Design a protein with these regions (language model features):
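Viral virion structural and adsorption modules
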Residues: 1-4, 133, 137-165
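Solvent-exposed edge beta-strands and adjacent loop segments
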Residues: 1-72, 112-125
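Surface-exposed, hydrophilic segments of mature proteins
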Residues: 16-22, 103-109, 163
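Structured, beta-strand-rich domain cores
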Residues: 57-102
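A short, polar/proline- and glycine-enriched secondary-structure boundary/capping micro-motif
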Residues: 23, 82-83, 143, 159
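A structural detector for beta-sheet-dominated domains
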Residues: 12, 31-40, 96, 135, ...
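Short beta-strand and beta-hairpin "edge-sheet" elements
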Residues: 96-143
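Acidic glycine-/aspartate-rich tracts in secreted/extracellular proteins
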Residues: 17, 76-78, 137
Length: 165
């Protein structure tokens, strides 16, 4: 079983002229050094299919809900400035699941928007929350793309690139 250590959520502005067949390819930024990353998949609602003839209630799976993700993480000026300047814009998001920081267990991609707010300032640490709205159906893209990450001396990403396989 894999752990979530080094899972990351990355983003970029939606390209004005995406490349046919390799939409998700390009350079991304780390959204926030996250403490946890919620699922972009909402729960599936159930549709009641019970009739007066049925002895028990019956249901079928309906649509999944797509809402928002509250991603709490480290409050860093450079990340805060980037997120504030991207507020209200359509963005491409990818969640890199796995322990290598490159999506070894899976890469989930979707289009959405984000906003940032600082959390309560305490004597312990300073955090902020990025609220990400999921506006398209998330899709798994790890079979089609590779991820290259350049990191600084502390292991924090300085450049994240997705390329078509």
């Amino acid at each position: 079983m894999a752990t979530g250590l080094k899972s990351r959520i990355i983003y970029r502005e939606v390209p004005s002229a995406p490349t046919e067949g390799s939409y998700w390819a390009g350079t991304y930024k780390l959204l926030i050094r996250a403490k946890s990353i919620p699922s972009p998949f909402g729960s599936t609602n159930m549709v009641d299919t019970t009739t007066l003839e049925d002895l028990v209630e019956t249901q079928e799976m309906g649509r999944r809900s797509a809402g928002s993700m509250e991603v709490q993480g480290a409050f860093e000026k450079s990340k805060k400035d980037d997120m504030v300047s991207a507020e209200g814009k359509k963005l491409d998001f990818c969640i890199l699941y796995g322990t290598d920081g490159k999506g070894s267990e899976g890469i989930c991609a979707f289009i959405g928007q984000e906003s940032f707010a600082p959390d309560e300032a305490t004597d312990d640490h300073l955090t902020g929350t990025a609220t990400v709205s999921v506006q398209t159906v998330p899709k798994w893209i790890e079979d089609d793309y590779t991820v290259t990450v350049e990191e600084d001396e502390n292991g924090y990403p300085t450049s994240i690139t997705l390329a078509k396989k």
